[in-house]
Amino acid sequence: MKPQSLEANIINPITPLEVTQELSDNVILTALDDLYDWVKMSSLYPFMFGTACCFMEFMGAYASRFDMERFGMIPRATPRQADLLITAGTITMKYAPALVRLYEQMPEPKYVMAMGACTITGGMFSADSPSAVRGVDKLIPVDVYIPGCPPRAEAVLDAITKLRKKIANESLQERDTTQQTHRYYSIPHKMKVVPPAVTGQYLQSHEVA
């Protein structure tokens, strides 16, 4: 190989690459599942569904101190371009059809992250409220839970790391068989009517006593 002159190095400081005959130096060999999982976990596009104070902590995770965009997470304004749904805050019965509709509009594969006690269990608003949904997993399947009231930004980053590990270990064939499909609510089927859990009997017994 002819050495380059000083003038050529100044104009083009990058020397041309040498092409070898070794296959490992020129071609990357990997499985299709590994390539697919690497692409998915490196480009998660979240869609935020925030209804309460937990969502404010999630906004802090996008600040310069944590910078969640370094994971390839670019927020999207429409569910049709997102593959990660993040719910934060209380989900009410009126919100349930809209939330399920947004989830159904997301393309496969899609993931759901429940953030905060109100989303996971209904929180303090579900104790005596017949309109609060006691857990978003009764409406849509959830992949990662972030407990807290509200959870800190460090917990959000830890959840993102766990979700990336889950995606990295997925298989295309296993996902079709293990994906949760049964839900209490869906677009073609109505919400199942169940007897109310809070009937006020404990209040009546307390007054009698």
Swiss-Prot record:
GO terms for molecular function: 4 iron, 4 sulfur cluster binding; iron ion binding; NADH dehydrogenase (ubiquinone) activity; quinone binding. Its EC number is 7.1.1.-. It catalyses: a plastoquinone + NADH + (n+1) H(+)(in) = a plastoquinol + NAD(+) + n H(+)(out); a plastoquinone + NADPH + (n+1) H(+)(in) = a plastoquinol + NADP(+) + n H(+)(out). Its main location: membrane. Keywords: 4Fe-4S, Iron, Iron-sulfur, Membrane, Metal-binding, NAD, NADP, Plasmid, Plastoquinone, Quinone, Thylakoid, Translocase, Transport. It is a peripheral membrane protein. Binds 1 [4Fe-4S] cluster. [4Fe-4S] cluster binds at C53, C54, C118, C149. Its cofactor is [4Fe-4S] cluster. InterPro entries: NADH_UbQ_OxRdtase-like_20kDa (IPR006137), NADH_UQ_OxRdtase_20Kd_su (IPR006138). The keyword ATP-binding does not apply. One of its GO terms (cellular component) is plasma membrane-derived thylakoid membrane. It is an enzyme of class 7 (translocase). Signal peptide: none annotated. HAMAP family: NDH1_NuoB. NDH-1 shuttles electrons from an unknown electron donor, via FMN and iron-sulfur (Fe-S) centers, to quinones in the respiratory and/or the photosynthetic chain. The immediate electron acceptor for the enzyme in this species is believed to be plastoquinone. Couples the redox reaction to proton translocation, and thus conserves the redox energy in a proton gradient. Cyanobacterial NDH-1 also plays a role in inorganic carbon-concentration. Belongs to the complex I 20 kDa subunit family. This is NAD(P)H-quinone oxidoreductase subunit K 2. It comes from Acaryochloris marina (strain MBIC 11017).
